[in-house]
């Protein structure tokens, strides 16, 4: 969860904090966590495969995790993070509302889609990180750093320092993200729901 799950866990916590601040002036926080982890590339069936398409050299860390978060207002979030997924990094967020659905394709960002029957068509052109082949449908970012929000994050940090305010990705978000991930590991190890003290 720490290596791959911190981004989606942080994203859902950020959205609930923002919702709470807009509705009542205080963030909606995570109340409990249920989680599980696994090392799917270490199971015998995968180890027996002669050709391995998935990254499998990780040591002392899971390559699959899932966490169910329950928030103070009773809403839920299901977060999965994994390396055992062909086609590169996937960071997808779906919010199901009582009056709509919001689908966010953080990565792959689908603003640009390209196709080639053979990866050699693209030559040395960079497509995206952690993709095992350039063949088939691909989702390159016209400006990967901008599309992933790195300049915007830095701009907010500089503005926060200049204006004397907390950045959008501030200390409470960082603290709660780490707290939820740690609680997730405790849940996975002990096989139980972990309640967070508030």
Region annotations inferred by a language model:
Residues 1-76, 81-88, 172:
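Rossmann-like dinucleotide-binding domain that binds NAD(P)(H)
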Residues 2-10, 148-155, 172-179:
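A structural signal for well-ordered alpha-helical segments within the folded catalytic domains
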Residues 30-32, 92, 101, 193:
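A residue-level signal for beta-strand positions that form part of recognition/binding surfaces
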Residues 37, 55-65, 71-152:
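NAD(P)-dinucleotide binding in Rossmann-like oxidoreductases
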Residues 50, 97-99, 124-125, 188-197:
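Juxtamembrane/interface motifs at transmembrane-helix termini
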Residues 72, 143-145, 156-198:
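C-terminal helix-rich "cap/oligomerization" subdomain common to oxidoreductases
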């Amino acid at each position: 969860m720490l290596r791959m799950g911190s981004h989606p866990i942080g994203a859902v916590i950020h959205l609930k904090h923002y919702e709470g601040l807009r509705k009542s002036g205080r963030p909606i926080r995570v109340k409990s966590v249920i989680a599980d982890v696994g090392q799917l590339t270490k199971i015998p069936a995968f180890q027996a495969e002669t050709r391995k398409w998935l990254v499998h050299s990780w040591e002392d860390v899971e390559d699959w995790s899932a966490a169910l978060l329950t928030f103070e207002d009773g809403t839920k979030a299901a977060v999965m993070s994994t390396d055992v997924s062909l086609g590169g990094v996937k960071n997808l967020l779906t919010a199901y509302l009582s009056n709509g659905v919001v689908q966010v394709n953080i990565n792959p960002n689908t603003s640009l889609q390209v196709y080639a029957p053979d990866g050699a068509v693209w030559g040395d052109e960079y497509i995206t990180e952690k993709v095992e082949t350039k063949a088939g449908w691909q989702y390159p970012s016209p400006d990967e750093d901008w599309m992933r929000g790195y300049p915007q994050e830095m701009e907010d940090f500089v503005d926060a320092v200049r204006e004397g305010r907390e950045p959008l990705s501030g200390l409470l978000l960082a603290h709660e993200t780490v707290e939820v991930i740690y609680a997730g590991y405790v849940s996975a190890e002990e096989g139980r729901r972990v309640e967070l003290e508030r």
